[in-house]
Amino acid sequence: MPKLRSATSTQGRNMAGARALWRATGMKENDFGKPIIAVVNSFTQFVPGHVHLKDMGQLVAAEIEKAGGVAKEFNTIAVDDGIAMGHGGMLYSLPSRDLIADSVEYMVNAHCADAMVCISNCDKITPGMLMAAMRLNIPTIFVSGGPMEAGKTKLSDQLIRLDLVDAMIEAADPNVSDERIDAIERSACPTCGSCSGMFTANSMNCLTEALGLSLPGNGSMLATHADRKELFLKAGRQIVELCKRYYEQDDVSVLPRSIGTFKAFENAMSLDIAMGGSSNTVLHLLAAAQEAGVDFKMEDIDRLSRKVPCLSKIAPNTNKYHMEDVHRAGGIMGLLGELDRAGLIHKNTHTVLGMSMGEQLDQYDIIRNQDEELHKFFRAGPAGIRTTQAFSQDCRWDSVDNDRVNGCIRNKENAISQEGGLAVLFGNLAEDGCIVKTAGVDESIWKFTGTAIVFESQEDAVAGILGGKVKEGHVVVIRYEGPKGGPGMQEMLYPTSYLKSMGLGKKCALLTDGRFSGGTSGLSIGHASPEAASGGAIGLVRDGDIINIDIPNRAINLEISNEELAARRSGQDQKGWQPAHREREVSFALKVFGHFATSADKGAVRDKTLLK
């Protein structure tokens, strides 16, 4: 029978000093022997997705105490990718993921905690905590802060729905008036919560449901809705139950590595492909799989992308649907239900509810279960009132969206496309693969041949786009922006937004060893691996080269001979794989990250071989 980890610091004569310190935190005599559960919060006033989390930790903690556990809260950092976007701050975003994973490990192991409730929300916080959960392998439940309500404003006598990406695109268009930009800016992000579309934050919170590590509704229930409170309370109660099952009944099925199996990672990736989620999820799932000891690779993602259809098109891929609409359509359980009916998920994986995924779908899929309370839960909707307060409204749609022909979530027969919303491309430009979010690409340019225009940094690319250097038919190549080359693998939302604002969104392609915001759409191909700084062929492209992109055949190639490619490689080997004429301040912390970082096909995790 597993022994409570916390017994190391709470039991025995030699731990009198540790117990004295525990007592100073408020523990009583009868608390020693109970599971100590870490409430891993990520509250910060810097991030709208986390600004409302200050009291959530104590909400969960109180429920843990009622259920018979001892709750101890601590905080992690949280970077807002939108605020860090477009300047040197973006270099710190991806490295913060690994810092979060390490800090959770440090706190939990230093204090011998028995279990965790992870209160996450935005882009790198959920992945960082997920990596830590897999690394630590103690009972863990995720509960996120929830998505923001979609912005709404009236322009030209028409009510439109929008988000922060709309604000970025409009602001870059010189033909748009200051008054219109101001109206959009003030309306784009109306409430607390993670940005309202299927960007990276919401994608990752949805994937925790598919992995089985969070409760149904976690990815889609609005941050502002009163019903979300029950998710926090239930997480507090359920984590104590998981502790009992593991520490008292030796039930290893409740552990993260038993839940996050290869099949569970396939379920998560299938969901991501079906909903056209952020391409960043590929990076984070690969990283989490490595922490879990699961051999999940780019080739597996490629295989899934060829058979899983795109069942939903959500902002930024359309302005018709946002996360509030996904919830109304049954949330992630609704999407997984459609994948199940198509025979595309594994139903025998475990979940934190202590049941199989199949059993969970029987209970929470609105198509197969007509329970009135379940449908009421998924009718929770937006209030349209600006607020930074959680649980501040109780508005509901009149009905759920169960239209699987033309609704927010489709069935396989009426899929938006029979191939999924993400694709992996291979070729001489990306021997280890690269990622494109096909859900955001107009099918007219799924096959694209263009002329390369090369930039050694995102800053140079932005200047080139805004300065008119980029023309119709160009493939914009931005290199030395990978995990090692950046360092930090910053997002390229500004270049893609500016291409759209210049009317080039369907007339150009963009290829980078960096990554893209979850808000990106268009023919934007990222994660080119190996990256330029690791000797990848993207570092050998020259202005004027012809690049062929073929999404249907999953290919991307530089149209030069093997002999010419080898000659260029030999020349670059002598010069060194570094950006030419780039001026960038790189801190010691970022240099450390870059030194250990692997390319994107490995999840940009640390290269453990360097420690041998």
UniProtKB/Swiss-Prot annotation:
Statement: the UniProt record of this protein carries the keyword Iron: yes
Cofactor, how bound (note): Binds 1 [2Fe-2S] cluster per subunit. This cluster acts as a Lewis acid cofactor.
Required cofactor names: [2Fe-2S] cluster; Mg(2+)
Binding residues for [2Fe-2S] cluster: 122, 195
Binding-site residues for Mg(2+), renumbered to this chain: 81, 123-124, 491
Key words, A-Z: 2Fe-2S, Amino-acid biosynthesis, Branched-chain amino acid biosynthesis, Iron, Iron-sulfur, Lyase, Magnesium, Metal-binding
UniProt entry tagged with the keyword Transport: no
Catalytic residue positions: 517 (proton acceptor)
Gene Ontology molecular-function annotations: 2 iron, 2 sulfur cluster binding; dihydroxy-acid dehydratase activity; magnesium ion binding
Biological pathway: Amino-acid biosynthesis; L-isoleucine biosynthesis; L-isoleucine from 2-oxobutanoate: step 3/4; Amino-acid biosynthesis; L-valine biosynthesis; L-valine from pyruvate: step 3/4
EC code(s) of this entry: 4.2.1.9
GO terms (BP aspect): isoleucine biosynthetic process; L-valine biosynthetic process
Pfam families linked: ILV_EDD_C (PF24877), ILVD_EDD_N (PF00920)
Superkingdom classification of source: Bacteria
Function: Functions in the biosynthesis of branched-chain amino acids. Catalyzes the dehydration of (2R,3R)-2,3-dihydroxy-3-methylpentanoate (2,3-dihydroxy-3-methylvalerate) into 2-oxo-3-methylpentanoate (2-oxo-3-methylvalerate) and of (2R)-2,3-dihydroxy-3-methylbutanoate (2,3-dihydroxyisovalerate) into 2-oxo-3-methylbutanoate (2-oxoisovalerate), the penultimate precursor to L-isoleucine and L-valine, respectively.
Protein name: Dihydroxy-acid dehydratase
